[in-house]
Amino acid sequence: MTVTNEIDAPPIPRLKQKYREEIIPALREEFGYTNIMQVPGLTKIVVNMGVGDAARDAKLIQGAIADLSAITGQKPKINRAKKSIAQFKLRQGQPIGASVTLRGDRMWEFLDRLLTLALPRIRDFRGLSAKQFDGNGNYTFGLTEQVMFHEIDPDKVDRQRGMDITIVTTAATDEEGRSLLRRLGFPFKED
């Protein structure tokens, strides 16, 4: 009997492999980067679900936490109010939302599911706006409901919850970030 010390590494996410093999050389050619470290890449994806109604009913935050953990496969962080605002009936420390920060392979897997499964399931989807960059190559967009993710069972949804998704890149300009995301498969509207 022979013992092998080989450990099977988990498979590389499909989008990460495409980025390494196709997108890096294409971006180097497009922008004329001399060093491979200059090529923009993805740093993290932040998925945020604000639940303003949780100020009146604290149980609503549990639904948001359950939805976010099902969608991202990671336990969300509860966002709490920084200070009390009487007009909104809000007290300091009250839970008002939940967010998840995805990095590494989980980030690539989530992005793949978002682009190939979730966005095409949106009714009357015409593409994402190409103007929502922040000036530093990061892109933020909002989704109006969580049902487009196949991890969520539409029959068990207690209420619609929207979410903000921020894709943080190492791109220095919006043009570089737009080119990176377009090559990754983001369906931007043609203006």
Swiss-Prot record:
Classification via Gene3D superfamilies: 3.30.1440.10
GO CC terms of this entry: ribonucleoprotein complex; ribosome
GO biological process: translation
A GO molecular-function annotation: rRNA binding
UniProt keywords, alphabetically: Ribonucleoprotein, Ribosomal protein, RNA-binding, rRNA-binding, tRNA-binding
Source taxon at top rank: Bacteria
Pfam families for this protein: Ribosomal_L5, Ribosomal_L5_C
Subunit description: Part of the 50S ribosomal subunit; part of the 5S rRNA/L5/L18/L25 subcomplex. Contacts the 5S rRNA and the P site tRNA. Forms a bridge to the 30S subunit in the 70S ribosome.
Function: This is one of the proteins that bind and probably mediate the attachment of the 5S RNA into the large ribosomal subunit, where it forms part of the central protuberance. In the 70S ribosome it contacts protein S13 of the 30S subunit (bridge B1b), connecting the 2 subunits; this bridge is implicated in subunit movement. Contacts the P site tRNA; the 5S rRNA and some of its associated proteins might help stabilize positioning of ribosome-bound tRNAs.
Family, similarity comment: Belongs to the universal ribosomal protein uL5 family.
Protein name: Large ribosomal subunit protein uL5
